[in-house]
Amino acid sequence: MSRTIMAFDFGTKSIGSAIGQEITGTASPLKAFKANDGIPNWDEIEKQIKEWQPNLLVVGLPTDLHGKALETITPRAKKFAQRLQGRFALPVELHDERLSTTEARSELFSMGGYKALSKGNVDCQSAVIILESWFEAQWG
């Protein structure tokens, strides 16, 4: 049985999301949720989770280039993951998101130039990259 996985790219102002199927290992961007100092509108996230009914949530874990925690944002991303798990009673995994934003900007620019580089687009594409990277890690 293939699982549906939803991923989040946590940020203090915007949280990107993506959805994917384990059987295909591919992901598609969904929505960027505005956040107020890292706190999203939980009702909007709940609506999306009810609509897509994922079996698992993956949250990008921000680290530096060497995989070390970043002082301010890493603990907040972990807290967001804990809140997702507590609110929605779904399993949540953290996944390294190193360079996902850089890669997202590059992919979006190649598809649509500067116009494609809106904050929401970048955050959702980052969530796609996080999820596809998570799929790759599962398959070794």
From Swiss-Prot:
PANTHER family: POLYNUCLEOTIDYL TRANSFERASE, RIBONUCLEASE H-LIKE SUPERFAMILY PROTEIN. The lineage of its organism: Bacteria, Pseudomonadati, Pseudomonadota, Gammaproteobacteria, Vibrionales. One of its GO terms (molecular function) is nuclease activity. Its EC number is 3.1.-.-. Could be a nuclease involved in processing of the 5'-end of pre-16S rRNA. The keyword Hydrolase applies. It comes from Vibrio vulnificus (strain YJ016). One of its GO terms (biological process) is rRNA 5'-end processing. Gene3D superfamilies: YqgF/RNase H-like domain. HAMAP family: Nuclease_YqgF. Keywords: Cytoplasm, Hydrolase, Nuclease, Ribosome biogenesis. The keyword GTP-binding does not apply. It is found in: Cytoplasm. It comes from the Bacteria. This is Putative pre-16S rRNA nuclease. Belongs to the YqgF nuclease family. It holds the Pfam family RuvX. One of its GO terms (cellular component) is cytosol.
